[in-house]
Swiss-Prot record:
It comes from the Eukaryota. It is found in: Plastid, Chloroplast. GO terms for cellular component: chloroplast; plastid; ribonucleoprotein complex; ribosome. The gene is rpl20. Binds directly to 23S ribosomal RNA and is necessary for the in vitro assembly process of the 50S ribosomal subunit. It is not involved in the protein synthesizing functions of that subunit. This is Large ribosomal subunit protein bL20c.
Length: 119
């Protein structure tokens, strides 16, 4: 049986994979089979970590808010602050609260005073 040269289609497919692997090193950049394996692995990792990133940032924001509320004695802890915010219908997301707690603690006092005044 004669050898069939696989025209431009296979080259185009491999070139596309190679463009994804442009920042890899060593054999991961040069060998086609290794390139496909590593690119597939990189895509799996990037998808997994995009999902995990949301979880990690939420945990970071919660721990920052909790630390700020305990240090500045705004409330006893994070859960009481969030409970009172929802009870008084002052909906602030955790990202904004964490930024306020870290960058400007005076505004955290004003938020807590709003909650206490509404009581």
């Amino acid at each position: 049986m004669t050898r069939v040269p696989r025209g431009y289609i296979a080259r185009r497919r491999r070139a596309k994979m190679r463009s994804f692997a442009s920042n890899f090193r060593g054999a991961h950049l040069r060998l086609n089979r290794m390139i496909t394996q590593q690119v597939r692995r990189a895509f799996v990792s990037s998808h997994r970590d995009r999902v995990r990133q949301k979880r990690d940032f939420r945990r970071l924001w919660i721990s920052r808010i909790n630390a700020a509320t305990r240090i500045h004695k705004v409330f006893d802890n994070y859960s009481k602050l969030i409970h009172n915010l929802y009870k008084k219908e002052l909906i602030l997301n955790r990202k904004i609260l964490a930024q306020v707690a870290v960058l400007n603690s005076n505004n955290l006092y004003t938020i807590s005073n709003k909650i206490k005044i509404i009581n």
